């Protein structure tokens, strides 16, 4: 018998023990996602975010997943590594390079929508753009930092839509992987969104396995299933520098 089924983002949310209204998960691979749970039926009338049944939805207990997707996330960071960063630089080197530049990248702005149509923009395909460059002032480090900041700002634009639907995004659960390995990315996301970020040692494949185990009765309840979930790190918003982040 089939004990569980779910897509990649519900699996990721499940792996992070995200089941109840107000709980939020995120991932930041090739594309980036913020996924939250609603306890009532709601939707964005422009379909900029998707609403569908979460893994624990029943007729008696409404549990809907709301999914924000930003296509130009890790793919932009990878493009920046190939085309902008110094030859041989890895992602950790890029983070060190970007750290040499102040918040806001001295006015350089990267709009990260270069991976096809974006649902959050009502399926418009506007492309990626880089602006604000001064040939006498800016270099590779500015573009590397601005790319990560642009991704964060696009996340926050979509999160505002989710908040308009009644979601309280005060805490984000994520696996410590992909762009969440970047201190710059996660610190900027926490400080711009105002949300605490909790990083865990898990991924979507673990979620699929846990879901199957819960469905098959191997675990007596969710508490038992996630008793071994390991929290690795907590990132708080930088309230001291919040004005700098918001001005950027």
Positions of predicted regions on the chain:
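Short beta-strand scaffold segments in enzyme catalytic cores
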Residues: 11-14, 32-36, 110
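Glycine/Thr-rich phosphate-binding loops that ligate phosphate moieties of nucleotide
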Residues: 36-248
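Conserved active-site beta-strand element of glycosyltransferases/polysaccharide synthases
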Residues: 25-26, 35
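Conserved phosphate-binding catalytic cores of ATP/NTP-utilizing and phosphoryl-transfer enzymes
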Residues: 6-23
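Short pre-catalytic strand/loop immediately N-terminal to key active-site residues, enriched for Gly-Thr
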Residues: 2-3, 199
């Amino acid at each position: 018998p089939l004990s569980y089924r779910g897509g990649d983002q519900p699996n990721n949310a499940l792996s992070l023990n995200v089941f109840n209204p107000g709980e939020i998960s995120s991932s930041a691979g090739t594309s980036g996602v913020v996924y939250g749970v609603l306890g009532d039926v709601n939707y964005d009338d422009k379909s900029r975010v998707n609403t569908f049944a979460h893994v624990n939805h029943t007729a008696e207990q409404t549990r809907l997943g709301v999914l924000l997707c930003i296509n130009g996330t890790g793919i932009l960071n990878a493009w920046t590594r190939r085309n902008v960063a110094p030859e041989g630089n890895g992602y950790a080197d890029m983070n060190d390079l970007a750290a040499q530049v102040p918040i806001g990248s001295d006015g350089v702005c990267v709009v990260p929508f270069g991976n096809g149509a974006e649902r959050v923009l009502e399926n418009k395909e506007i492309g990626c753009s880089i602006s604000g460059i001064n040939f006498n002032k800016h270099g590779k480090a500015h573009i590397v930092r601005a790319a990560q900041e642009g991704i964060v700002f696009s996340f926050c634009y979509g999160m505002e839509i989710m908040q308009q639907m009644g979601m309280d995004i005060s805490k984000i659960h994520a696996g410590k992987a992909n762009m969440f390995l970047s201190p710059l990315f996660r610190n900027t996301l926490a400080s711009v969104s105002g949300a605490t970020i909790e990083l865990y040692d898990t991924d979507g494949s673990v979620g699929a396995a846990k879901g199957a185990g819960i469905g098959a009765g191997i675990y007596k309840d969710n508490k038992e299933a996630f008793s071994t979930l390991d929290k690795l790190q907590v990132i708080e918003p930088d309230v001291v520098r919040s004005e700098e982040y918001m001005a950027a």
